[in-house]
Amino acid sequence: MNAKIENINGITNITKKKGVPLKILQLTDIHIGGSFSTRKKDKLALQAVEKIVNASDADFVIVTGDMVYPIPWLLQGSFNNLKSSKKFAACMEKLGKPWTVVFGNHDSEVWATANKKKIGDFYASCKNCYFSHGDENVTGDGNYHISVLNEDGTLNTVLMFIDSNAYLTWNFFSGFDIIHDDQIEWYKNTIKIIGAECGKKPEEVNSLAFFHIPPKEFREAWEKFYRGDKSVIYHHGFVGEKDNYFGYPKTVEGKFFNEMVKFGSCKGMFMGHDHLNTLSLTYKGIRLTYGMSVDYLAYKGIDKRHTERGGTIIEIYDDGTFDTKMLPLDDIEHKSFFETGR
């Protein structure tokens, strides 16, 4: 481990070693069904998680939502999302890495037996999990932060975890929700307080945001890049969803991205939700990155696909800059085959 993680009085800090990048692994969209009929695909998903985590050599693992999939029809997932969450957590705990999560739109569907509060209580009780419910007066569940410190105790980066919520009403057909205005204010206030403690202006505090549902500006950035706009910087990945789909909220206008551009602290946003998208672009000074997904269940035929499955490595350096790279499961399995014959 190239980092030390401490939680003192509910405040979590990660202290990185000097001269060695802090290595974070982003996982997303695991989609454990938790029923008898999904047991084979659940096993594949958990085996994939184990392979990716072990291959990553990460100091910390962040899962950006949809750990479980309590959809009882067609795909026959279990109503019991707590049971499914426990299956996922058991896998993570066995691997022994420190980890945390944010909620996706599927983690607590309206017909599921446990709400986000109950699921969050369970995650927070896990020995190696650093999930926090955050401020109960802010929209959602799980708006919290973890500070990354340099070896000398100075602030490096703030990891901001945000509940991007689920649907506008109670179901999928109402459309996806947004990060709400009070969550944006919570983000700003958190950075202002941390900055004041170390004598920095908000724009001098580097922060990275982790959530599930992408903002519409990711699509905007991709369209500009596709048309040859040199102001958009391509890093890696592709858009694999049919008709170049981006699953951002279509019926309500979110302000999060533009407010973060003006605020100046946020340098990167990491999300999931669209399982076949692995794109990473920098737009208006913010790096937007889809994590590689794990899902074997939610998309028809996705268990036969390979190019989107894996993890995303985020390396944070001494000066607070960072970089990302894809960690495809195919590469891990091919390397294992050539080294061991299995």
What name fits each language-model region?
Residues G33-F36, Y69-P72, V101-T113, Y167-W170, ...:
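Active-site environment of divalent metal-dependent phosphoester hydrolases
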Residues M1-L82, K87:
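N-terminal active-site segment of His-dependent metallophosphoesterases
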Residues S37-K41, P72-N81, W111-A114, F172-F176, ...:
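Short, flexible/disordered intra-domain loops and linkers
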Residues D29, V49, V61, D66, ...:
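Divalent metal-coordination and catalytic microenvironments
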Residues P21-G34, N156-A166, F210, R287-S293:
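Active-site-proximal beta-strand elements of phosphoester/diester hydrolases
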Residues N2-I5, H145-G153, K255-F263, H275-R342:
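Binuclear metal-dependent phosphoesterase catalytic core
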